[in-house]
Amino acid sequence: MSIESHLLLENINAEAVDASFSYGTKQPGAGYYRLNNPLHTAVYTVNAFNGTIKIQGTLAMYPRDIDWFDIEGTTIGDDSTIMGGETVTPVLFSRNFTGNFIWIRAAYNLQDGTIVSIRYNY
């Protein structure tokens, strides 16, 4: 049963000029509250999306750039496939991941389309 739900990104449609990633604002993970259930679920809502999105975590209470790491199994997209098609109807993808992460954030490289939202709960 989820306890908390957080919004990581919303209405992103600025396209990247290169292969570098942009980052959303950090949000608390299960480890922040010292919860015993480290299961998280991320839901990605995209529309005509071409790019890459992944979730990053950290075990540091006051993280620096080098403290963040990619959470395995959370990546969608590969910079070459349009996800969500060319329709006006957004498409949802979900990924489960476990860990007592203190902070969670979204990393993204948007080549085209829209990231409608990325939400996660634990």
Residue ranges and their predicted role:
Residues 1-36:
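Transition segment at domain starts
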Residues 4, 9-11, 16, 65-68, ...:
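Intrinsically disordered, low-complexity peptide-like regions
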Residues 26-37, 69-122:
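Beta-sandwich interaction modules
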Residues 38-42:
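Structural beta-strand segments of beta-rich domains
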Residues 47-52, 111:
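Short proline/glycine-enriched turn/loop motifs at strand-loop junctions of beta-rich domains
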Residues 50-70, 117-121:
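Short, surface-exposed beta-strand/strand-loop-strand elements in extracellular ectodomains
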